[in-house]
């Protein structure tokens, strides 16, 4: 068994809570948890505790929720914990150098991609969007840059043709905790090896936007299909028809030459709605019309065949 470390954990969403759960079941001592202050959530905009806070309180772990680390009080509070290490997973706050230097062994971060390929806010989504064949998690020693620190461990897995950001998120939420525990064992035993990132291979994974998720039918069908998977569960790829915004949950690419204007429906039946694109054909298989749940195209056509007649144009 490796040496037990005194760990401060910093994280906020469910992805982070799954890592905290693994730490709470390990030989390491979780001496405190940092998470973002309550934010209004849901339709009622009620102040809701983060999944990390909820889990920490269930295990009687002290919780700290500073707005930032600018005050002397917040810095002194962290220093007083006398931590060996801070583990950061999707915390959502920038950590200044004074915080990074406070724990004896510094701060490490679990990042949801293979660095340095995708640094930044949306690495899971961008790996699918770009057509990458694999992704994973990188555990790195944090520095003042954005995901630029030396890498301590990389764990990879393939991106399947059917993977969405939602399914990939779940896979990485299983892979990450396992990689984290292995990395902590190396750190505790003094055998961890830090590898510098090649900045020349780095890309920035920009945040997604609703505007970006609107389908451009002039793009190639392969790119549109990747966007549909990358933007699920948010912001959801969509198009306009009959002044209604239609969300696309599932589609496939059919390789064939097209002469029609991109966005033109060239076939619509129970096998799908076939739409001309800038290259090849995109076959829509599952859609969501306003006020309804996602349905197979066959059901959509039974209800709204008038919206999807052959020759009509999607925008």
Curated annotation (Swiss-Prot):
- What are the record keywords, sorted? Protein biosynthesis, Transferase
Q: Quickly give the catalysed reaction.
A: L-methionyl-tRNA(fMet) + (6R)-10-formyltetrahydrofolate = N-formyl-L-methionyl-tRNA(fMet) + (6S)-5,6,7,8-tetrahydrofolate + H(+)
Recorded GO MF terms:
methionyl-tRNA formyltransferase activity
Choose one Gene Ontology CC annotation of this protein and give it.
Answer: cytosol
Entry binding sites for (6S)-5,6,7,8-tetrahydrofolate: 113-116
**Ranges in coiled-coil conformation:** none
A Pfam family cross-referenced in the UniProt record is: Formyl_trans_N
Q: Name one GO biological process term.
A: conversion of methionyl-tRNA to N-formyl-methionyl-tRNA
- Similarity remark: Belongs to the Fmt family.
The protein depicted here goes by the name: Methionyl-tRNA formyltransferase
